[in-house]
Regions:
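Extracytoplasmic
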Residues: 51, 69, 304, 362, ...
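Primarily short, surface-exposed interaction patches in extracytoplasmic proteins
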Residues: 125-199, 204-487, 522-523, 543-601, ...
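Extracytoplasmic soluble-region selector
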Residues: 9-139, 143
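Short beta-alpha junctions and helix-cap segments that line functional grooves
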Residues: 2, 85-89, 293
């Protein structure tokens, strides 16, 4: 709808010329557009109202190229910071970032726009660097003229590191010991200690169980399948196997799904198109669904790419075994995916890569070797981005599983470096976590300064994150010294260890635990809402656990003073002692005639567990 062009435009002239010639079809040998390049690759616009002309060139299948700037369609992701005119001119607005997508023919590309404040006297502080991560973060902050916040204090760091790395809270004694330690290496030492805890494995097995959709599904996938799959995954992380080898085992799995649980990847999902979509979203961070019915409007992928990549999954065979819960996965050696348009067979082709030789081979093994290797530029970056998002609260590409040209990384150089180091380091998962946690970027305070208070994408300060459902239930149980019981697990097992995505409680559901119905990262809900607040205030989880665990009663029976109990509650829950003001106000309630100290301190315990400081990692 609406007016596309007027009678005096070049587009009008071309259309009239074509119609006058009888509206001929293009000859069969007409060169096709195979690539699109935009210049500049990044534009920095200082102050509002500054303009920058873009140039777009198309490359054709016959080796020629031409300027297509005026024929290209431009779309800005943030027109408040950078507008793009129809003829390819950028105009800056308020400080911020934008990505301008450029689309010509069936190809999409784009450029990053940084609209920075007019501050010629800006000086970046002389900040030390913890490692290469800080180098890349600082380089970006210098460009956008943002000053990073300072480092968090030791109390904040130990709580943050415990929650992020192992999903637990530090014991009160551990907090006091850590704070009292004057060694300059104590934070790095703590990170190493936590990486060697069994809870680290449990955290990442849970996250990968979500990606791999480990859940029962009536008769198609029963609890024995789920627990064998889950335990196989746990064994891989316990051995710290290179993550690329784990993925290659999953994609190339064959044999019985009981004897080789990795094969359950092909028992949970049997539709070959859906398998391809899941594999690209999990292992490459890409959502290919759009390209099934039409060329992706916001990315480079075409329908040809979609069906060619899906053809790697076209020859998977499945048959029953003596146990009807198990399937035998094998290579049928025949069968192809056909393009929905024209019903033609698309030879298996790597995304953005070549057409490999698959004759006489298991196509999945060919795919596995490429996908989880250095030859695939998307794999290592995707894993690095996924881990980064866990520790930083958002990905360098966000959402983490929506990588596309029109959703670029906020810091491409940082993401590239993380991916390269992961690959060169043998896909050592722990080393990646170690690098992130030892950076000053991870260790910053959540307190903002004047320059970064509006920034949310450049990691100039730490983010405040609500603790995810399983971890929140676990730490409530931890500090109240109570236990939970989940299906198939012993009494006292943590919520992080739940095998089946179908197993849940009202608490876990309310706080956004993933059901594992899809591979989408959006299944884990971290946004706070009214239902959560009401359940904490009025539900039986916090209320019953405070009393059931008997923390306060036992402490008073051990002859601890109310003042000591208050300190211990704060240290156990918040990893800090109360401030002098907090302590004075709380002690005023102790010794009341009409209430026992036990009741007063239990009320305090309940209040702490309902506080934002407890529920959020900061």
């Amino acid at each position: 709808g609406g007016k596309s062009f007027d009678e005096k435009s070049w587009m009008y002239d071309i259309l009239i010329e074509w119609l006058t010639a009888g509206a001929p079809k293009d000859p069969p040998n007409t060169p096709k557009v195979i690539d699109l390049e935009i210049y500049p690759k990044q534009a920095v616009l200082e102050g509002p109202g500054v303009s920058q002309r873009l140039t777009v060139r198309a490359k054709y299948s016959d080796g020629t190229d031409r300027d297509v700037t005026r024929e290209t369609v431009y779309i800005s992701s943030n027109s408040m910071s950078a507008k793009a005119t129809a003829d390819g001119v950028l105009v800056s607005g308020q400080p911020g970032e934008a990505f301008v997508m450029a689309r010509f023919d069936q190809i999409t590309t784009g450029t990053q726009i940084l609209a920075i404040p007019n501050m010629p006297d800006f000086k970046f502080p002389n900040e030390p660097e913890g490692n290469y991560i800080d180098t890349h973060v600082y380089n970006k902050l210098k460009k956008v003229r943002i000053t990073p916040s300072g480092l968090c204090d030791d109390n904040t760091f130990i709580r943050r590191a415990y929650l992020d790395i192992i999903g637990k809270l530090p014991e009160a004694a551990a907090v006091e010991k850590f704070v009292a330690d004057n060694a300059s290496t104590k934070r790095a030492k703590l990170v190493d200690e936590l990486l060697n805890r069994p809870e680290f494995v449990k955290m990442w097995v849970m996250k990968w169980a979500e990606l791999l959709q480990i859940r029962t599904d009536n008769n198609a996938f029963q609890y024995k399948n789920a627990i064998l799959y889950f335990e196989w995954l746990r064994a891989q992380f316990e051995k710290n196997r290179p993550i690329n080898e784990i993925v290659q085992d999953l994609l190339g799995a064959k044999g019985g799904t009981f004897s080789n649980p990795a094969g359950n990847f092909y028992q949970i999902q049997t539709d070959q198109l859906k398998l391809m979509e899941n594999a690209t979203q999990i292992f490459m961070g890409m959502r290919m669904q759009c390209a099934q019915c039409h060329n992706h409007p916001f990315d480079r992928w075409t329908m040809d790419d979609y069906y060619a990549f899906a053809n790697f999954f076209s020859q998977i065979g499945r048959k029953g075994s003596e146990d009807n819960r198990e399937r035998i996965i094998y290579n049928r050696g025949s069968g192809d995916v056909r393009h929905v348009v024209g019903n033609k067979i698309m030879p298996p082709k790597f995304l953005g890569g070549e057409v490999p030789d698959v004759k006489g081979k298991d196509r999945r093994e060919v795919l596995a070797k490429w996908l989880a290797s250095d030859d695939n530029p998307f794999f290592a970056r995707n894993i690095a981005n996924m881990v980064w998002a866990h520790f930083m609260g958002m990905g360098i590409v966000e959402p983490v599983d929506d990588v596309r040209i029109s959703n670029p990384p906020s810091n491409p150089e940082l993401l590239e470096e993380l991916g390269k180091r992961l690959a060169k380091g043998g896909y050592d998962f722990k080393q990646l976590v170690r690098d992130i946690c030892n950076s000053r970027t991870y260790q910053r305070t959540v307190q903002s300064n004047e320059s970064n208070k509006a920034d949310s994408t450049n990691f100039a300060k730490a983010s405040i994150r609500r603790v995810r459902a399983e971890v929140l239930l676990d730490i409530i149980s931890q500090v109240t010294n109570t236990q939970n019981k989940f299906r198939g697990l012993p009494n006292g097992a943590s919520a992080v260890e739940i095998v089946d995505g179908r197993t849940s409680t009202f608490f876990l559901t309310t706080f956004g635990r993933a059901t594992r119905d899809t591979v989408c990262s959006c299944e884990v809900a971290l946004e706070p809402n009214l239902s959560q607040a009401l359940h904490l205030l009025n539900g039986d989880t916090v209320n019953s656990k405070c009393v059931q665990g008997g923390f306060v009663k036992k402490a008073l029976e051990a002859k601890k003073t109310p003042s000591q109990v208050i300190d211990e509650l704060y240290l156990s829950c918040l990893a800090r002692k109360p401030t002098a003001t907090e302590k004075e106000k709380l002690m005023a309630f102790v010794g009341e005639k009409d209430r026992s100290d036990t009741d007063v301190l239990n009320d305090l315990f309940w209040a702490i567990l309902n506080s934002k400081e407890f529920i959020f990692n900061h």
